[in-house]
Regions:
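C-terminal helical subdomain
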Residues: 178-181, 186, 197-253, 258
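Conserved glycine-rich cofactor-binding loop
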Residues: 13-14
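Residue(s) in the substrate-gating loop at a strand-loop-helix junction
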Residues: 140
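Conserved glycine-rich Rossmann-like NAD(P)H-binding loop of the short-chain dehydrogenase/reductase
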Residues: 29-44
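Active-site helix of classical SDR
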Residues: 121, 156
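Substrate-binding pocket helix/loop in short-chain dehydrogenase/reductase
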Residues: 96-98, 105-107
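The beta1-alpha1 cofactor-binding region of Rossmann-like NAD(H)/NADP(H)-dependent oxidoreductases
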Residues: 38-39, 59-70, 103
Length: 263
């Protein structure tokens, strides 16, 4: 059995999830990397090893409960325990007004952004109870906003926040929370800037493009450091909360534990 904390991170092949895995590796944690692209996961696994952590690569689609259960079972078999989950996998599509949205696309968004977290938690709940585990569900400011042409994304994230409140009420031995990672320089932002011309209002697209041009997008490493800290150290009083990544109660101790840079 691993003597280090074992954390499952979904959406770990790029962007925020990959950065979370790297920070966890710097602390020496064992990380199960979950995403749909095995090739990209293997690249992140190499980074994890260089930074002092150990990893397990599991190719899986979080919208499939059986795939999530396999990820949990494989982690348990490999490391002997599961201490934390970081449910980061998410998609911003479909981007269209409600009247024009394909029902199958809308359903798929909810399956990834909401059901994916439920599936992994459901599969891992016994292991997490055993180790008084932590669950960090990555949400969004969109959970509290009405963004035109992003109804599925907004709905999924809002539901994720309330699901996490219920989870925290039911599982008093666990620490379960949602976190807003801010506006991060990831592939999701690239989609909003470059692939939404016929979907989003023009002023909304202009706003996203200005964020990039002005250098106002947060590097993934900054919110990822906060999320990694929460996965390892989130106190019980955070359970059920929707927290900002730059909340001083998180960002300050995260900086103290991990330092300013990954290397």
């Amino acid at each position: 059995m691993s003597e280090k904390p074992v954390v499952i991170v979904t959406g770990a092949s790029c962007g925020l999830g990959a950065a979370v895995a790297r920070w966890l590796a710097k602390s020496g944690a064992a990380v199960t990397l979950v995403a749909r692209s095995e090739e990209k996961l293997l690249e992140i696994a190499a980074d994890v090893g260089r930074l002092g952590g150990s990893s397990l690569v599991v190719k899986a689609d979080v919208s499939d409960f059986h795939a999530c259960r396999t990820a949990v079972e494989t982690t348990r078999d490999h490391f002997g325990r599961i201490d934390s989950l970081v449910n980061n996998a998410g998609i911003v599509q479909p981007l269209a007004p409600i009247a024009d949205t394909d029902p199958d696309d809308w359903r798929h968004s909810i399956e990834v952004n909401l059901f994916g977290s439920f599936y992994l938690i459901r599969a891992a709940i016994s292991d997490l109870r055993r180790h008084k585990g932590r669950i960090v569900n990555v949400s969004s400011g969109a959970a509290t906003m009405a963004l035109e042409s992003a109804s599925a994304y907004c709905t999924g994230k809002a539901a994720l926040n309330h699901f996490t409140r219920v989870l925290a009420a039911e599982e008093k031995g666990l620490t379960a929370l949602t976190v807003r990672p801010g506006v991060v320089d990831t592939g999701m932002q690239a989609v909003l800037r470059n692939e939404a011309d016929n979907a989003l209002p023009a002023e909304q697209i202009a706003y996203y493009r200005q964020l990039k041009e002005r250098g106002e997008l947060e590097p993934p490493e900054v919110p990822a450091r906060a999320i990694a800290w929460l996965a390892l150290y989130a106190p019980r009083e955070f359970s059920g909360k929707f927290l900002d990544y730059d909340d001083p109660r998180i960002s300050r101790p995260a900086l103290e534990v991990f330092g300013e840079t990954l290397v």
